[in-house]
């Protein structure tokens, strides 16, 4: 076997399953895999899954060029409050900024509401004298002796494991923070230090301080995890690059991940959006709703012209998971998506009012849904899907895991139907209707906020449960077109292989367009580009392959929040003022449906995204031949009732095949059920494309079309 490094592996650690995709560029081989997540030791599932994929493809660990993975470790650490003991050194007088926050109520109707608990208690927050003005000039020198005494006290008396340094206006001039790190390193060389001017060099001291503290909070844990994972993989013989997915959809090096682990807060979900963007672009779909439904949550985001929407702020560790404002603010680039507690493992129960409620509690992988026969007793969405015919009890994970249909029937009858006084069939249908309506309502609101109409989009469904629920969701959204990629159940792991190595950076510099110092703006970009180039070259890139994209956060003077606007390639000058203004007005009109022609426009932050190209990967399979139709089973479709449905072996289909619904398409990791009003076509990339409401007479009947195809 050649020892040339030709294999890339993507790994997605989810709440229920860990998904894998292996791609060998020379052999043109792509193989997927799925294992139950091991929450007590996340790296174990990774190592076991990689070992299995290598064995199945007759490969060696020495052939692996890179392993890219996303992790929920940062998110879980913040949610569970299991991070390091952190100390904060700030400007004197700003010790309590974390508790003061924005001084707003996230729920005006809840008189007993509690803010998200701060992760750095007051005893570990201390201010020191020294001040930088808003224009970057030094107003008062840093009190270095007081700083040293404060750090000694925090480490020796309070036992802090990591420090955050956040001085006022450091985004404009980081000199005091840089000097502080020098002093701390001389005192405690091994202490991990986060500077707010490096992790979030933008205005708004509360958000910047919160980001720095949360970065310090998760840093020791991520250092340990990444070191352990690297050692475990090295024992397999792996000597390639280990890379991590960023929350914004790019891929970064282990060194960057260790320095700024907070940028991995949405690492896992971003991969699904990147996979959706890659698939949509290859298929020529300009407007797509990415719908990723796994075992724990459902995530939706918009993908337009081959790129997912992104935003530059995020809220972590919410007291109420789905209430905006109840968490801790972060200045990080993330894929702009909505997430609701509606996954295959979401538990259905009768609440105190005698009504059925689904989620956000999830059965996860342990004990899992009742169908898994691993000790679960509470019925879940997956159990309802099995009961209603959407899943094949003998072909879950390609037959690796038999599903316990009798146990599911009994659990729904005793836990739900009995308490509600309804038939078991109605209870199962109720679970599915509730979860579909929850996802539809969240998607409608997300799109309405952006002035978008779902009817003009294609629903791209993936995740283990996404294709199962795609038809029901599409009907509620009045979407007419559904696309289901091959390997849909592991498509998030595929996203790691098609995401580009990337650096996102920003600098705060506030000024009105007509008075901006454009030379200073160009200096900011020169610094950001130099740093980005260094990171990407260390990641193995070539200088000529690096693509730089500039953007800025602009607003009308006096507004509290801004909108991102793409900038022309630099260097910039006063001659670009009108082009920047026009771009802002267009973006503002698209979002708010109005503009104010005479109001001054103000720039807040200047952003850079630098990336390398990525080698295209396809999950297309080679048709197995034989007859695709496996028989029939009864499936309940909303609006049609129980319908005898053709069962199709997806692996036997080839491009150009057409199937009139109702039909359920089975593959190892997921199933797609197309209703009676669908016509499904297999495109050149082996995507299933379902047209809802298409004229079924124009499509061949399943038996005839598929018989002729073979």
Locate predicted features.
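N-terminal glycine/serine-rich phosphate-binding loop of ATP-dependent small-molecule kinases
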Residues: 1-87, 133, 140-164, 177-196, ...
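Conserved short loop/turn motifs at secondary-structure junctions
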Residues: 65-66, 164-173, 215-218, 428-433, ...
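Conserved phosphate-binding loops in N-terminal lobes of ATP-dependent enzymes
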Residues: 10-13, 17-21, 29-45, 50-51, ...
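Short beta-strand-loop/turn "lid" adjacent to the catalytic site in phosphate-handling enzymes
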Residues: 31-34, 61-104, 164-177, 200-214, ...
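Extended, charge-rich low-complexity interaction segments
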Residues: 158, 218-237, 510-528, 633
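Conserved phosphate-binding/catalytic loops in two-lobed NTP-binding clefts
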Residues: 186-211, 478-494
